[in-house]
Amino acid sequence: MTPARRMPPVIGRNGVAYESPSAQLPLTQADMLDSHHLQQALQQQYFDQIPVTTTAAADSGDNMLHGRADAGGLVDEFESKSCSENVDGAGDGLSGDDQDPNQRPRKKRYHRHTQHQIQEMEAFFKECPHPDDKQRKELSRELGLEPLQVKFWFQNKRTQMKNQHERHENAQLRAENDKLRAENMRYKEALSSASCPNCGGPAALGEMSFDEHHLRVENARLRDEIDRISGIAAKHVGKPPIVSFPVLSSPLAVAAARSPLDLAGAYGVVTPGLDMFGGAGDLLRGVHPLDADKPMIVELAVAAMDELVQMAQLDEPLWSSSSEPAAALLDEEEYARMFPRGLGPKQYGLKSEASRHGAVVIMTHSNLVEILMDVNQFATVFSSIVSRASTHEVLSTGVAGNYNGALQVMSMEFQVPSPLVPTRESYFVRYCKNNSDGTWAVVDVSLDSLRPSPVQKCRRRPSGCLIQEMPNGYSKVTWVEHVEVDDSSVHNIYKPLVNSGLAFGAKRWVGTLDRQCERLASAMASNIPNGDLGVITSVEGRKSMLKLAERMVASFCGGVTASVAHQWTTLSGSGAEDVRVMTRKSVDDPGRPPGIVLNAATSFWLPVPPAAVFDFLRDETSRSEWDILSNGGAVQEMAHIANGRDHGNSVSLLRVNSANSNQSNMLILQESCTDASGSYVVYAPVDIVAMNVVLNGGDPDYVALLPSGFAILPDGPSGNAQAAVGENGSGSGGGSLLTVAFQILVDSVPTAKLSLGSVATVNSLIACTVERIKAAVCRDSNPQ
């Protein structure tokens, strides 16, 4: 008998040598010659060392190598298992071929990877979840594993992560569905208990009001948006889990819950006087941040402050020079390299807008900081840019009796004076700091993870201003505006303006601040010369009249934009020149006449520079050329207040010398203002008795106003925007974008129904005014 040759050991997992059990047994000459059995034995010994993957993702490969995998070998979340296996009792004297085929399979034991191997593969998985053959072989050599063991571990890990994400997203979608069902039940209950505001009886569903119809349309739109986002999320498996937040109530749900619960008082102080055509939007009813989130908010605000200071002070290569003076363009690649922290990469579907602008303004740094940190003052000073604002929570009031270290969670809605440009809502934290070099900085940064909204269309990266004290009560302000927005809804005629940064950029913020600082200085001036006819010299009279004009301009700006709180209805026109109208009821408001007010607005392009349009509209001698309500009568300026260096910045009191005796007691209050970003001419009829009270220093809040007017913007950056708008009211440039808006009291009874005749009359009024303005300004710009 020939002695059996000892087989070499097979190297298994973890470097352990496994000897063949049959190597200890004597073989006959026939067995030695049976190469087929010998080959099967060697193959069985080799494949016994290979791990078996048990996940669904690797069933096919597993079946080829091992037959059916054991179901108990699934890898748990915390520890990966190698399914390398040895048959128990391998040394019982029977080879694989000699075992009884009817005998029940032996219980298999599993060998776990070491903690070091798991940690190394986990770290590699974070960097590369799909290693190639070369990477797997390298990893197997480093960890003492077979390449197939590494391959199957990564297969198991990928399947595990996929299952986790699918479970999380399914739970999230189920929660959204439950909320929608509960919301639908609230709607049904609210409709079933609805009562008539006039008689108190049950309201007939067939008599749905105009506002209720729009609320239903808005609710349907929100449902479609949630379905669309859910569909997109279901396709992107493998992304990090999205933190689930409660969906904000729709306007109808808010209206239904307003009676038993004061939501406005529960969610923050909404700035009074800004919400003039409807309730606050969902964003401005944002929730308070949780206590657990406040450390993250503080950390984000500190990082944003560091970023803002650097962006305000650094030049090239971060900022490249621009054709406009004191303006700069941001290098996106350099920005991403310098500031890897913060909000992270740009979100899909959003476009970056970044700008920087500086100016010296006539105001102390302490007063500027107070305006920026007081939401009421901020909304008043920037009423042409901010349509609505609220502070949800004050996390810190500052130290040492000032705003150093103040931290506030806020939300705002930013606007352009036209119904063709949607407003931008933002939910952010505002942080104020006194830097070591003596400068003050105020920064805003969006709270993306806390924003309770399924759709985000505006994200504020670190934006704000750096304030440096100057002699004689002046301050140098450097403003940085950096946002990511979805501007797909902007009308085509306004896209060049928006893309240039003149609509929402830093230049508009600084220009508005500079003009308002001059206005405040004018209101406080006491050395007014008495030589000019009609100039109001009384300090109290000037303050009261300027305050009344300020409210008039804020009311005009807040009522002409495409805010989420406004529901515009398109009447007629073609394209951009459609006339849009909306109604509101004025009740118990001393600043507005009671009744139903109809607001109509339209925007159009003029081939005339903005400065020429501004001079034509503010000049009282040319008013009869476009003002139909003056009945062709001559207009005379009765009083005048200059409130800036530019002679176009003024408040005037006008008298219309009309043949109609019914208008003998009516005056017109008008404010005209212009800066480097745009111009306004706003006016309102006022009672002569009420104006006498104001001129004597009386309270202007009780003067009823229905402002109308014009907003004049450049049509883009072409032709040098500064020359196009004119810092001194003159200059030449490209065309103009003109918005015309009227407010008309159509019925003095707030509960009356709006008639189609009133709408048709206002539509004809605004259309006729537009045609007159086009004819007049085009004739003046092209004299024969």
UniProtKB/Swiss-Prot annotation:
Write the record's keywords in alphabetical order, separated by commas: Coiled coil, DNA-binding, Homeobox, Nucleus, Transcription, Transcription regulation
List the lineage, top down.
Eukaryota, Viridiplantae, Streptophyta, Embryophyta, Tracheophyta
User: What gene name is given for the protein in this entry?
Assistant: ROC1
Any one Pfam family match given in the protein's UniProt record, by short name: START
Spans annotated as Disordered? 81-115
Q: Which PANTHER family match?
A: HOMEOBOX-LEUCINE ZIPPER PROTEIN MERISTEM L1, HOMEOBOX-LEUCINE ZIPPER PROTEIN ROC1
Q: Where is the START domain?
A: 290-522
Q: What's this protein's name?
A: Homeobox-leucine zipper protein ROC1
GO MF entry, a single one: lipid binding
Chief subcellular location: nucleus
List the GO terms this entry assigns under cellular component, sorted alphabetically.
Answer: nucleus
